[in-house]
């Protein structure tokens, strides 16, 4: 197992370099770290949650990590292979603002129907609040997930149909400096 998994085949490296914002050397370095942490070459939801717990020790990141895991797991087989990992990492850490917003939209669109409903956003925002715990002091108008979602929908849901399209989400996010800043701070954390 050890030697055969320690390096990616050149054609795989080339393909991942084409599909990501990483150089060949970076892809190899990420692969080395991935295999060190995941000797089987795959990461399951439990392992993914453990990683998030290291970053958010004062809250409970379990629910949020599960949502992120589901976006990373492109083929929906319950495991993240290296190619899925590196492509998601590329978008979240080095992608354009539009790429990051499309990725975030997939995160919020829990049932993959092309819309973000108020309940879907509430699930994600609630998970974020659980994850950060009491480490972040929130303004009065956003101190509950419900208040935050109400504020977001008031700003983004232009046609007041109770759901956000990708376009509404992108335009609304770009109009809110705190969202743009959050996406930038998030670089590489995912």
From Swiss-Prot:
Ca(2+) 1 binds at residues 73, 75, 77, 79, 84. SMART domains: EFh. Brain. GO terms for biological process: regulation of neuron projection development; regulation of signal transduction. Ca(2+) 3 binds at residues 157, 159, 161, 163, 168. Its main location: Golgi. Residues 24-59, 60-95, 96-131, 144-179 form the EF-hand domain. The keyword Ribosomal protein does not apply. Ca(2+) 2 binds at residues 109, 111, 113, 115, 120. PROSITE patterns: EF_HAND_1 (PS00018), EF_HAND_2 (PS50222). PANTHER family: CALCIUM BINDING PROTEINS, NEURONAL CALCIUM SENSOR 1. Neuronal calcium sensor, regulator of G protein-coupled receptor phosphorylation in a calcium dependent manner. Directly regulates GRK1 (RHOK), but not GRK2 to GRK5. Can substitute for calmodulin. This is Neuronal calcium sensor 1. It comes from Xenopus laevis (African clawed frog).
């Amino acid at each position: 197992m050890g030697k055969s998994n320690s390096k990616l085949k050149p054609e795989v490296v080339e393909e991942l370099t084409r599909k990501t914002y990483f150089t060949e050397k970076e892809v190899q370095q990420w692969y080395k770290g991935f295999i060190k942490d995941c000797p089987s070459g795959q990461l399951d939801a439990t392992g993914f949650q453990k990683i998030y717990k290291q970053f958010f020790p004062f809250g409970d990141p379990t629910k949020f990590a599960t949502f992120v895991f589901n976006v990373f797991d492109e083929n929906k087989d319950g495991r993240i292979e290296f190619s899925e990992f590196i492509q998601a990492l590329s978008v979240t850490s080095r992608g354009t603002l539009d790429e990051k917003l499309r990725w975030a939209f997939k995160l919020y669109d829990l049932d993959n129907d092309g819309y973000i409903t108020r309940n879907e956003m509430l699930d994600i925002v609630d998970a974020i609040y659980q994850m950060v715990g009491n480490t972040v002091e929130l303004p009065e108008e956003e101190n509950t997930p419900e208040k935050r979602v109400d504020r977001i929908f008031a700003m983004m849901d232009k046609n007041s149909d109770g759901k956000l399209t990708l376009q509404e989400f992108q335009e609304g996010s770009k109009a809110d400096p705190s969202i743009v800043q959050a996406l930038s701070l998030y670089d590489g954390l995912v």
